Amino acid sequence: MKMLQSVCLACALTLPAHGFAAASAEVDAIVERAAGHRVLLVGEIHGTVEVPAAVADLAQQIAAVERPLIVGLEIWRGEQQAIDRFMDSAGTYEDRTQLLAGEFWTREYQDGRSSAAMLELLDRLRALALKSDLRVVAFDEDPVADLDGAARDKAMAERLARALDEQPEAVALVLAGNFHTRVQASAPWDPEHRFMGHHLIDYQPYSLEIMGVAGSAWTCTGAEVDSCKARDLPANSIKPELTLGDEIGERGHHGVWWLPTVSASAPATAPPTATFP
């Protein structure tokens, strides 16, 4: 454990202060468009630097409205106490050590949700909470629950709904994988499946995907640990742009923000000397 902690700390201390700043015009447009909704769902492909950074920028803009803000992250709910402790801390070396000691961060199967970029997002939210009414909610089920996809989506939505009901005056900004954030009434593979976003329909969600046209992401392609690594995104002809619609699109969201490029973010507990293939 001591060796693991030293590796974690070395990585944590090499995090950039703000490795990516989302374009302010796009962030402003998203916040303005979502202003009439209680929940802003952000769907991602896990494991990039840029999307968690964009979520931090969105949180900063939304918090400026001076309404209580709930930021939901697809982290195991068993980590909630450690997150609360970190949010109340000064963000020191020791504080990061304590946070990164959790099983979510140290697990072998690193799927991009426990990346250095996610740690940086939490640190930016911690700093923002010093001057704003903001709290972070870890809404994913712990793995011991062993739920199927539909049950997990429902459980995640219920966790977020409870947080919203506890603070009727609050709005929520939620980051999750871009299947969970779909608000459509069914799944392409199962007309009975309900995504997390659809379960939150009573809370007037606005759903937006943020993804990269080019670059790389830390992803897993199977259940095996060695399937998780940095991968280049496939070539495509998509144009980088922000589209904010009024209706649910073919991808199950209201809008999409295609960033020109994204870059893979390694696990927060990876050795700082780790290189990408």
PLM feature segments, named:
Residues 19-277:
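Compositional signal for N-terminal targeting/processing segments
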